[in-house]
């Protein structure tokens, strides 16, 4: 029998009690938040995309508490990750001093996140009315594609709640990989059909050089 991945501590404990069944800790599975960078207004629409602004994308690092996700949502079966390189692979060890400085710089700071996002939203011409962001007379609605097969549903709900708390209206669109892939990876981001997606990836081997991950996640291609 082959079983891969769980974020349920009780399930893990049951597996460990089964005689003759071996298990190992794997660091290959990781989740990330994919953001649509088109904009700041989607072409041929009045729909604002705040994530076209680099400072708003950056501010999400202060808004989201990775440690909460790892300890509470994943039941302690995960660890916070800030970069597209695995923390247990050689590249991270080589960059540990720089990585640690960045991890401290982007530690959770909700008030700073709110301040930066507020400043940038006002620059875009959005206004906060009754605690909700509006743009050209309509609520700023973020379409959030949330995977349902695993802990990403709870991660998505957690992040959606944070965004709603600072004034965004969030349309939570739940679905499986089959449901959502045509939108975020098979469609044109400029169509404005989504703003965020709960991405998930897996590393199947120990890599000595993960430099191409920066190209994959951070450049246009």
Task: Put a short name on every predicted segment.
Residues 78-80:
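Structural signature of outer-membrane beta-barrel domains
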Residues 1-73, 89-221:
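Extracytoplasmic/periplasmic ligand-capture domains
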Residues 83-88:
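Outer-membrane beta-barrel and related beta-rich outer-membrane complex signature
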């Amino acid at each position: 029998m082959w079983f891969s991945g769980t974020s349920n501590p009780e399930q893990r404990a049951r597996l460990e009690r089964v005689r003759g069944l071996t298990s190992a800790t794997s660091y290959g599975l990781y989740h990330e938040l994919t953001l649509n960078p088109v904009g700041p207004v989607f072409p041929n629409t009045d729909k604002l995309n705040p994530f076209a602004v680099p400072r708003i994308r950056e501010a999400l690092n202060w808004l989201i508490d990775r440690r909460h996700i790892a300890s509470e949502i994943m039941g302690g079966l995960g660890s916070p990750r800030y970069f597209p390189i695995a923390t247990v692979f050689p590249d991270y060890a080589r960059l540990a001093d720089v990585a640690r400085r960045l991890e401290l710089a982007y530690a959770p700071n909700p008030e700073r996140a709110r301040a930066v996002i507020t400043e940038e939203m006002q620059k875009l011409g959005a206004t906060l009315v009754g605690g909700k962001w509006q743009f050209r007379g309509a609520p700023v609605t973020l379409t959030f594609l949330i995977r349902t097969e695993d802990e990403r549903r709870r991660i998505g709900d957690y992040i959606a709640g944070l965004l709603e708390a600072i004034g965004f209206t969030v349309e939570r669109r739940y679905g499986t990989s089959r449901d959502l892939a045509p939108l975020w990876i098979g469609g044109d981001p400029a169509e404005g059909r989504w703003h965020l997606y709960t991405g998930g990836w897996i590393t199947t081997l120990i890599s000595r050089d993960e430099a191409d991950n920066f190209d994959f996640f951070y450049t246009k291609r």
